[in-house]
Amino acid sequence: MNSTLTLTQEWDKTFPQNDAVDHCKVTFHNRFGIELAADLYKPKGAQGPFAAVAVSGPFGAVKEQCSGLYAQELAARGFLTVAFDPSYTGESGGTPRYVASPDINTEDFSAAVDFLSVRDDVDPERIGILGICGWGGMALNAAAIDTRIKATVTTTMYDMTRVTANGYFDTDDNPDARYALRQTLNAQRTADYKAGTYQRAGGVVDPVPADAPFFVKDYHDYYKTPRGYHPRSLNSTGGWNVTSPLSLLNAKLLAYAGEIRSAVLMIHGDKAHSCYFSRDAFTRLQGDNKELLLIPGAVHTDLYDRMDIIPFDRIEAFYHQYLK
């Protein structure tokens, strides 16, 4: 299929380009017909077929941020990688814009596997995925349904369906709280239809209140400063559509995590507010090819871009072990 997307060609990432890695823009379609934009990275001068890894996340970010950093670093270590913008976000297609879906966004990972599996420079039996933050949960769901995925890494994982339905730390895990949320979202849905547009929720709060939780301040330090700001990132700008949680509210993203047979490495900072997502998800996983790696002292956003904290040596070793 011919691409209908308009892609920037200049280097507009939040991280420096590695001269030891070749880079180009690519596109591919998912099963719903949505065209996805991605950055492809591979070791300069190396010959395939390569083991390959598809990378996405965090939730509300774009490929020019954390996922691209991970993808480029893995390419420097010998893998062919793609960092993609999920459907409805970034340079990828899909309308309306700025919505998330556990079904479609899980499919986005499988679409990346489609793309990788037919390339001459990729070994289709050696394909893995890596999901950051909210796309860690999507990655586990993809691993549960797509048997072509041989190894999955999650870093600083969120279960977006759980946090949407239950609130942070499950403090709103009751029918009345969920009903009130449904009322609010459906009232907004009516208002959006009447207005012919979609109200945006706003990205990371700016300026950040002095009494904000530490993790909100951490998000601000990444998404709203030169460290991680990007103009196409929802978290850096206008945020998701207000009604986007409707897709997540009644779903159970990790319902079949216990049926994942392929290898999984879950990585989380032990001081992250979100660490309970990985701890709880790991208890569902079965088999001796599953590992939970907790990084002492690390918070949620440390695993976004802190090269001194992200355990790339362990990630590389994991993929070498299971993508062989």
Region spans (language model):
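Short beta-strand/loop motif that positions the catalytic acidic residue
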Residues: 260, 266-268
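Alpha/beta-hydrolase-fold enzymes
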Residues: 140-224
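The serine-hydrolase catalytic nucleophile loop
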Residues: 60-72, 86, 278
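Short beta-strand element of the alpha/beta-hydrolase
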Residues: 48-58
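N-terminal cap/lid segment of alpha/beta-hydrolase-fold proteins
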Residues: 3-48
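Conserved alpha/beta-hydrolase
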Residues: 73-93
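Alpha/beta-hydrolase active-site loop
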Residues: 99-120
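Catalytic histidine-centered segment of alpha/beta-hydrolase-like enzymes
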Residues: 298-309
